[in-house]
């Protein structure tokens, strides 16, 4: 609960600063990289979260690890360290993404199929989904052989289940 509140407050402030400096996309990309590292690297997560590691050490580490980032992104990360909020990075990034997606009219769509669709099929699906939603689609494909054939599309809270598995289950229930 606290992480979500802190994340929202900081994400809104950071987005506003990024927007004023015309750095919204750059910061979006940087925060995604930081988030992936935070989720996937235990040492990084431990360093960020550990209360006994001094702020200056954390800032030095961030500047070294993310040296390819532009100064603006590094300054934002160091600001989060200074305010003892880097450990809330998941909430900050999640909220920043929500703001970014809303303002840029982007929607995440998860599509699950029994087999990997071709690039042509993916392009056609994206085109149809963009027409349906009126937004740019960020498509994530998942493979699950248990659905037999067809597909399951998840757009936010809406699920469109056109799988053969669901149809068979419906027939079996009678």
From Swiss-Prot:
F(1)F(0) ATP synthase produces ATP from ADP in the presence of a proton or sodium gradient. F-type ATPases consist of two structural domains, F(1) containing the extramembraneous catalytic core and F(0) containing the membrane proton channel, linked together by a central stalk and a peripheral stalk. During catalysis, ATP synthesis in the catalytic domain of F(1) is coupled via a rotary mechanism of the central stalk subunits to proton translocation. This protein is part of the stalk that links CF(0) to CF(1). It either transmits conformational changes from CF(0) to CF(1) or is implicated in proton conduction. The ATPase of I.tartaricus is of special interest because it uses sodium ions instead of protons as the physiological coupling ion. Pfam families: OSCP. Belongs to the ATPase delta chain family. This is ATP synthase subunit delta, sodium ion specific. F-type ATPases have 2 components, F(1) - the catalytic core - and F(0) - the membrane proton channel. F(1) has five subunits: alpha(3), beta(3), gamma(1), delta(1), epsilon(1). F(0) has three main subunits: a(1), b(2) and c(10-14). The alpha and beta chains form an alternating ring which encloses part of the gamma chain. F(1) is attached to F(0) by a central stalk formed by the gamma and epsilon chains, while a peripheral stalk is formed by the delta and b chains. GO terms for molecular function: proton-transporting ATP synthase activity, rotational mechanism. InterPro entries: ATP_synth_OSCP/delta_N_sf, ATPase_OSCP/d_CS, ATPase_OSCP/dsu. Its main location: membrane. Keywords: ATP synthesis, Cell inner membrane, Cell membrane, CF(1), Hydrogen ion transport, Ion transport, Membrane, Sodium, Sodium transport, Transport. It is found in: Cell inner membrane. One of its GO terms (biological process) is sodium ion transport. It is a peripheral membrane protein. One of its GO terms (cellular component) is plasma membrane.
